């Protein structure tokens, strides 16, 4: 005999109507909360039970969902040497920056692990090692941060500092950054609180001078002040749907104590500040090492101090929250050529894979690769120019490729890169084909 479902309402001893859970029959006095639906109610206990049942079923079907629910501190701690080797598979050069990042990240997650068992009030408190990366556009700052997050299997998000403003002004507030990290972790709060946030263009929020201004600077010093709270570690109420469009929503509290922040920027002109300071004791220092394409002095940037950053426009409190400072070198012709072909996800390898899916072998002549590098250097945007140069050339070829009959090989020449001339096509027997 089928059991009758419990109704959503019942009668008390004195005849008054009361709310009952439609699943377990408990009254509002027996539970913490009751959620109402069309002609039905469900209590918080039944919601929790239902969630556990669904979680187990989903985990059995989808292993990645189970992994997402597991605590991230169980992830194997990777040594600095192993981190640096892994970074080297994707990032060409920048050995000093890779070593600094490897040590800082290793210490950061070692610090988190130690917090799980260190309860003695006399224990030494290890502070968080947020990182500041200084280097020209297109030198790999974002790629380094992204690769680290992938290697460690932690949530990752990128924020543009230029879009941030103080709360109450048009633009994104700093809580938006944490909301994006929450999305990246599929709303897994524990994974969110151990993720990595990369804040790009951090130099753009420097105030115009080191002197205190009486005018309101909502996208400069004001943003630095707002970022202090989440950089140093605090519990922040984050609106999951975005703060300003949905002010009525319930906040999710995120503790930023164990979130690693990596800030990056070009800091154009910083080398001149350093040179001016250094030249007082060493005349002509660094004058022979300027990069001819970027104007950057890579050697002198390594001597950057907190005072230099303060003079540039970062407030002392903000600088203090970024104890690890590393610089990246401008990319020369050799480095750009290596970036094209050597990393695991090199752009040339990606194009070859795409052509392979169409049954066509793709080849670039050495002269073609040199021409790509020359054009990229002229544009002055580092490695990111490589893709844009190639994309502008390859788009027409990839548009026609699926409909070309009998083509088994495509050779990109220097003339193809420079003048958009037709590449060399070959049939399966090695004969050159002319495509009308």
From Swiss-Prot:
UniProt: Zn(2+) binding residues: 21, 24, 43, 46
Molecular functions per Gene Ontology: ATP binding; ATP hydrolysis activity; ATP-dependent protein folding chaperone; protein dimerization activity; unfolded protein binding; zinc ion binding
Pfam family, one: ClpB_D2-small
Start and end residues of each ClpX-type ZB domain: 9-62
Organism domain of life: Bacteria
Alphabetic keyword roster: ATP-binding, Chaperone, Metal-binding, Nucleotide-binding, Zinc
Presence of the UniProt keyword Transmembrane in the record: no
GO cellular component terms listed in the entry, alphabetical order: HslUV protease complex
Annotated residues for binding of ATP: 136-143
Disulphide bond pairs: none
Gene Ontology terms: biological process: cell division; proteolysis involved in protein catabolic process
Role description: ATP-dependent specificity component of the Clp protease. It directs the protease to specific substrates. Can perform chaperone functions in the absence of ClpP.
Family: Belongs to the ClpX chaperone family.
Subunit and partners: Component of the ClpX-ClpP complex. Forms a hexameric ring that, in the presence of ATP, binds to fourteen ClpP subunits assembled into a disk-like structure with a central cavity, resembling the structure of eukaryotic proteasomes.
Name of the molecule in the record: ATP-dependent Clp protease ATP-binding subunit ClpX
